[in-house]
């Protein structure tokens, strides 16, 4: 079933609605019209006890602060980084918002920090839609992005994206939800056990911008081809990882066909027994462990805090900055 409530209001006075889908087993997902974002996701532990496995806030206005990490929000038109805040496409140069140093992060955030329309609802699904006019934030085409969330009886949360444009354009949407399967944001995710089906990663420079090269992660601190705790090597020195930040890297998924629908990663929390399997038809997944979040002070849900290394994002995507690195 699906239930609609009022989540709250933005400083502009705009109302943010919340839609909660619950299956017959009691699992549920709550989704907001701001950024078509995931606010809560209740899933059972090994004993059947339900808990909220995602980070977030009680006040919708907090979701619009980019320093708080795009919690649970849809990112578009182009997720991740664009070098130099510009790209060439079909013989023309397009300039995007320079919102992070000398480059663009998450297209400037407009898709994430604005209200979406509810296009359709069903017993166990909802479709959100947002229209982006031609050249908004520098991207070509009158562009509509839709995302459909479906919660199944098997406790699978499915996200399906659809893009429509009246001219050739670029698109790379993702969702920026952070998981903490312990349901206790006071605990870091360093004890979570992660597997990523990848043997290569996108090499980056000192600004974490892709160089266009693919590196071999076999035997390095980034090698999650066999499961091991996130915290086991997160602070080990490595050229692609910023000291003190930890993992914030694109893994190139090992698939016979880069667009095949296959399992990308598995996240397991030993104490609760909760296990998350992430599937995608995209070639990459950004593993980000919240290292850029403040170490204290960020409010969360209830008395919790959204702080340093309290959640892990597994962002399925085309490779970062592939607008400049087509190969």
Residue ranges and their predicted role:
Residues 1-327:
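An exposed, glycine/acidic-rich loop-and-rim segment of catalytic or binding clefts
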